């Protein structure tokens, strides 16, 4: 093939230009993302049972739905929560690659089977089935810059005018409002109700009747008389709109003819629909909207669309209302991608300088340099064809590919230059001869490297998706690189290179010194190799010791899934003791805000707090803070990284009295959890009950706290059992007094919970009407005795006459995992430990708990456990495939052994570099290790290929052939290896956005390549001679 293009250079250029054009078009159309769809798709089923406690919700709603979720294609695991607000949420997580649309349809079909078994009140409320991500993409906060709007004014405007347009924006899966729109609040007074012989149900029924939209029909409607001349709509009654109108609702007419109006027994006002959350931005009243991605949506496109929509809506905002973004994960995505692009450019420049140093000829250097954009753009075209995105993983693949793809072109150019100099041939003839010598080596390298990366494409789960991104990117680059090296590169060599002048090229002083030093080094290397081959047994023992060291390093290197990143934002949770009020929670959140805005003012840009809300559940004792940091360029230095800020905050905020305040970083992949570290589900496999499971959980937390050198921040991601005030109704006594149980339940539910009645109109928007006891009549236990229920004879009977009360404990939030009662445990690895170490330690602690208590990993930890199980198989398959590819290529079983024996030399270097830098054996390291395996084999192939050719064509002995081959290939091996090492150097020294991943990829590859080069050039001749002698003896035998 090469000879064809040497004679047709224009054709080679045409193909290269077509590849670049295709790549250019692909880049303009490829979407940009931090990661591909790594996270498995999730479907969430949400239901509400008004007035029910957590246990009732679990028994009558959650379990009923769970038990029908069988036979779903690709379901991995299922988690659910039931809380004291009557909410049930079941999240079903499916295998990566499952269509969210199909999964949603299947879940909806299964839900229909459960519907008849659900309480009627639940069915009336409706059940939603959503396919949005469970994690927050961004938070938009709204503030009044001059204080003219209070938090309820702001929240009502946001709910009425902003929430719905945002929820319809492309890419938005769901929105969560931190605040509430206005509602008509009817605050009942039990004493006045009793005075007029009324109960809450009387109020509710009259509101329903008198606040109603009646369809009155028409005058002159069809069919009509032949001479009908009039047609008009009849308006009978419309919905009420103001507190004054509601206050005039007639409840009853007394015997003396006087009227009892709603305002006589209740206070009527325009209040919030929901008082459960309090939002603040830098301590000022605010409202906020959390945006969650739709399944499969692009984060950058969605964020851009949301901001454009808010910018459009801002033209209609009240004068003082402003939008701020206290939490946004997309700047990190944009900047990290930009950093990798920058790394790509730096790598190309460094590779060019290395090539120029070795080739010392601008014409020769420009040839492999031209190959870089051709192959990279061609790779983008392939990525577009297979449906990939421009993301961190594909860009890392490109950076790794630069060092690999120039290798082929360097091998071609260097050998053509050597033939021109040694054989005194003109460039075209020299190129023909050179390609005949190295064509098989090029094919061999391509086959080996492709064989290394091919098994990665068939791994499963989130890890498999990461591997696939690297695999397709690198294999595409390799194949295109070989194609360019056998088409464009020889064509360029034949047309650009010049014949060697008489006496050879005269290098400048710098190159002359370099050449002198290199020639001495080459001679020393040749002499050393000859010495090594006299005592191969001794060096095979050294090799075995190196392999043993590799095994030790493998065992001691900590494991993890993905490295943590400084994403420019993080969160802080606050949990107060059970029973704490919103007032106390708000004070704690203000202390958190003050700390970040004063003590960390050089690093923190804003703090947005939400009282009453947290990932562990909703409650007055829960709070969450979103902290936005200043740009990375303003936070230079490790002491200003998110990790350092969190460590300082953890110490400082631990001093807050009567609250557990915990700052935490975001996970590497947002959809795989809410916090970094590990995520464990403690399971009640033995059906021990909630109390025993709580005891086991507390024992586990106590054991973990005793080992701060292993794990830290181990905490339950749930709500503690809280005091509950139980009302025991004596049904027999109530029946004897003529009081219906339904009336008792209605009165208690309305007074101490609330009752949604119907809707009213406010500023052209339909809003809700709620009836509830006034604040003074539902604050204390004794308030229960102030309420009366009318009996069958029409007299008022106090609740205290047929009920008793007591204090008890119960959970405000119950959890289940795969249909088993569970409790979620979150935590972090201690300093110097990896998440893999922490997970193993926690598993050992669970083994010490009572029988019947088990565990399972979920979220990011589930994927980490899956990836650690797949890694050994991945390495083994890759090595086997490489061996078979080499055997097929050389039609020999012995030569592949000579090549494969070099692999541990590169692996030990990768492990040593990773260990010395304190990094872990994560997915990026595993990809780097496979790259190292391929590159180690490549260097061996370059030497072995020439040695085999000399043995076959020139009849040399194995020792003579390998010494000469090693001498001839030393320069291209060192050149290509140094080019690769410097190509990944920008990854190794990277800092700022995305540096965690870059360091993880670059460190192992750089260490591995360095070791593979330094050790392999000495050990490959040893391996070749030993294997040849062993196989020669085997044949004789």
UniProtKB/Swiss-Prot annotation:
Q: Which Pfam families match?
A: ACR_tran
The gene name on file is mdtF
* Membrane topology annotation: Multi-pass membrane protein
Under the heading SUPFAM superfamilies, the entry gives:
Multidrug efflux transporter AcrB pore domain, PN1, PN2, PC1 and PC2 subdomains, Multidrug efflux transporter AcrB TolC docking domain, DN and DC subdomains, Multidrug efflux transporter AcrB transmembrane domain
Q: Recount the UniProt induction comment for this entry.
A: Induced by EvgA, probably via YdeO.
InterPro entries for the chain:
AcrB_DN_DC_subdom, Acrflvin-R, MdtF-like
Localisation per UniProt entry: Cell inner membrane
Q: Which GO terms describe its biological process?
A: bile acid and bile salt transport; response to antibiotic; response to toxic substance; xenobiotic transmembrane transport; xenobiotic transport
Segments on the Cytoplasmic face: 1-9, 360-365, 414-441, 497-536, 891-896, 945-972, 1028-1037
Taxonomy, superkingdom: Bacteria
GO cellular component term, pick one: plasma membrane
According to UniProt, the name of this protein is Multidrug resistance protein MdtF
This protein's assembly is summarised as:
Homotrimer. Part of the tripartite efflux system MdtEF-TolC, which is composed of an inner membrane transporter, MdtF, a membrane fusion protein, MdtE, and an outer membrane component, TolC. The complex forms a large protein conduit and can translocate molecules across both the inner and outer membranes.
Q: Which NCBIfam families match?
A: 2A0602, RND_permease_1
